[in-house]
């Protein structure tokens, strides 16, 4: 059985090809995809006709409320591509190539008010909680560690923290709500004033409201994270930016832990920053603020989780962490 998981992330498109216990992972920068065919790149690693199922994520994923075959999905599964985050165009090209190819594929939804497994209070509070790759990451953590109850914090360009309770996604905080990531973060009073004054759009504010605003350093969506981390020990702004990120993520995790029984309080960290051990040990630093056992989900967890979702769908699973699957 060969499945493919595709993670449409901020800085690139990551692919996991899973052939039973073997995995092949490759990543393409979103800017690279403007000149390349995604399927041609995929075919360098696997014959397309051997693929049994692809699981795909795209943008906010707020236009669908189930995992659906790609041919049943309208408008790529989104209400609008406007909103939170920079638009580069690589993900759109990947999605359209796969749909036009006729390859068997399913589209994973994001977490939003239409997802019925979410607690009604979270659905009342927030229109959107997470983009689809966070579902894939949560599923990989669920399968790898075997936990039915845990808090997942995915820390990278942005930070999204989810609560999984009794094997279902219960709630969480989107990138624009609580903790900052390296690029994205919540909009504060100063930014609201700048938006109202017409100096910046809300989306532009969100896209640079993370650690980048404290570091006062921006090298584009693909290189800023590395630049800030590499300057942690020799630039005071970069040090403060990362320390502030650690504090904000810890506060977000701690706000969800009380919703779990004390003996079920576990934290899983994911993402390029959440799993970073050198030159800064991020999991160790977060543990200083969090009274729970911390586990680290290494690797390209969004793509791997997608491949696992596709595999389990082929095996007959029709519920992924509480999200319904429609597949024949």
UniProtKB/Swiss-Prot annotation:
The protein, known as: UPF0285 protein MJ1370
Record-stated family: Belongs to the UPF0285 family.
Record InterPro entries: ATPase_NBD, Methan_mark_12
Native organism: Methanocaldococcus jannaschii (strain ATCC 43067 / DSM 2661 / JAL-1 / JCM 10045 / NBRC 100440) (Methanococcus jannaschii)
Recorded superkingdom: Archaea
């Amino acid at each position: 059985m060969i499945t493919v998981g595709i993670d449409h992330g901020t800085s690139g498109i990551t692919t996991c090809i899973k052939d039973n216990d073997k995995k092949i992972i490759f990543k393409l920068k979103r800017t690279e995809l403007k000149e390349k065919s995604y399927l041609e790149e995929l075919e360098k690693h696997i014959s397309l006709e051997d693929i049994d199922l692809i699981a795909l994520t795209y943008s906010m994923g707020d236009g669908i409320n189930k995992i659906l075959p790609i041919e049943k999905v309208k408008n790529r599964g989104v209400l609008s591509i406007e909103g939170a985050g920079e638009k580069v165009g690589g993900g759109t090209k990947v999605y359209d190539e796969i749909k036009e190819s006729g390859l068997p594929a399913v589209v994973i939804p994001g977490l939003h008010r239409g997802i019925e497994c979410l607690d009604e209070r979270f659905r009342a509070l927030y229109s959107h909680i997470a983009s689809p790759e966070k579902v894939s990451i949560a599923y990989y953590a669920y399968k790898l560690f075997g936990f039915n109850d845990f808090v997942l914090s995915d820390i990278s360009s942005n930070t999204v923290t989810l609560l999984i309770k009794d094997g279902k996604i219960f709630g969480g905080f989107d990138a624009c709500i609580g903790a900052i990531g390296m690029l994205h973060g919540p909009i504060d009073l100063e930014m609201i004033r700048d938006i109202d004054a017409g100096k910046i759009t809300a989306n532009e504010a969100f896209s640079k409201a993370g650690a980048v605003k404290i570091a006062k350093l921006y090298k584009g969506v693909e290189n800023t994270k590395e630049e800030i981390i590499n300057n942690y020990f020799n630039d005071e702004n970069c040090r403060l930016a990362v320390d502030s990120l650690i504090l904000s993520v810890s506060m977000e995790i701690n706000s969800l832990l009380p919703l779990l029984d004390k003996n079920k309080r576990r934290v899983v960290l994911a993402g390029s920053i959440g799993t970073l051990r050198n030159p800064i040990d991020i999991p160790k630093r977060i543990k200083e603020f969090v009274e729970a056992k911390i586990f680290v989900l290494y690797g390209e967890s969004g793509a791997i989780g997608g491949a696992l979702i596709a595999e389990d769908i082929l095996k007959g699973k029709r519920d992924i962490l509480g999200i319904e699957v429609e597949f024949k």
